[in-house]
Amino acid sequence: MTTNEKALMMHEKWQGKIETTAKSHVNSREDLAIAYTPGVAEPCKVIAKDKEAAYTYTIKSNTVAVVSDGSAVLGLGNIGALAAMPVMEGKAVLFKEFGGVNAVPICLDTQDTEEIIKTVVNIAPAFGGINLEDISAPRCFEIEERLKELLDIPVFHDDQHGTAIVVLAGIINAMKVTGKNKEDSKVVVNGAGSAGVAITKLLLTYGFKHITMCDINGIIGKDSQNLNWMQQKMVEVTNLEGKAGTLADALKGADIFVGVSAPNIVTQEMVASMNQDAILFAMANPVPEIMPDLAKAAGAKVVGTGRSDFPNQVNNVVAFPGIFKGALEGRATQITEEMKLATAKAIASLVSDDELNENNILPEAFDPRVADVVSRAVKELI
């Protein structure tokens, strides 16, 4: 039985991967009177006077909404709200299993930016945080920014920032292995959607100076056509040398490649044209931009992918559960750039110098230390 066949069989068996479990058991009239009427009126009255009391008396303190419109689901594309449910349920499972955070999947049957924003604002009182998921670019940028302005709870688009944080963590350790540094390293980010933009922004914040972004048409620069508003903003802070040409042109003399794009678009010749001991994060799924063995044979020193069957898996699950765990425990109102940097450094620190090598630059998703270390890094900045 293949993995896909087993997944379908198990989803049919589960009929949903999460369920509601009661903390308060109702086994008597007294239990009923305390959990519901008349006793439930007391916490209601307290919250009515002080909305912060909701963190003490309700699930708000440890619950996030996983919100999607189904417009950019995995490699499946715009499959809509209902078809996105298995992914959002899975995300809720990961929140609970890896971070101890309760999560509710909410798939919205609209792809209108204003309707999504209004809906999330209206449901926000029930939650301590909002995790945006699988919303297409460039709409995802506006939706997140507007919600951050409107709400007093953390709003986090994991496709952007979770990916960026883990990529930075991996690069921090890969530079230790290769002896490269952020000031001199030339970085190429291929893919200018939500993940590519967020990765580039975080690398710039960390201190990288030489970053070139590419899309399906090649190098992105001031003369590029058909850029969306966010890509136009990125032109102002990337490709400062004014390069033009193809991805192959961009990779000549580069030190680091980050791919969030399409399968098999990087050749061995391209890798060979990069600087010595190149770092490649080829994260297209399920087939990366170049297979690790081919990249290594062409001269790459460190290669990461999004897959669990290769070394150096770049997996968001080492980031988002701990980030929200820390944000909720610390009652953060937002997740800042400083928190993202601290999280990346914390994740990188989990691989000791003795353990660090070209095939081991990131902690395993099942490392029990991860969520607590990440949550502490977040809470220290609240």
What are these regions (language model features)?
Residues 1-153, 375, 381:
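N-terminal ligand-binding/catalytic initiation module
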Residues 69-71, 79, 108-109, 134-137, ...:
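Short, ordered loop/turn segments at secondary-structure junctions
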Residues 12, 55-60, 96-97, 122-124, ...:
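Solvent-exposed alpha-helices and their adjacent loops that cap or buttress functional pockets
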Residues 105, 131-134, 155-158, 189, ...:
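General beta-strand structural signal in soluble alpha/beta enzymes
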Residues 74, 81-99, 157, 165-262:
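Glycine-rich phosphate/diphosphate-binding loop of Rossmann-like nucleotide-binding domains
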Residues 158, 282-382:
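Adenosine-phosphate binding glycine-rich loop
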Residues 232-302, 307-309:
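Rossmann-like adenosine-cofactor binding region
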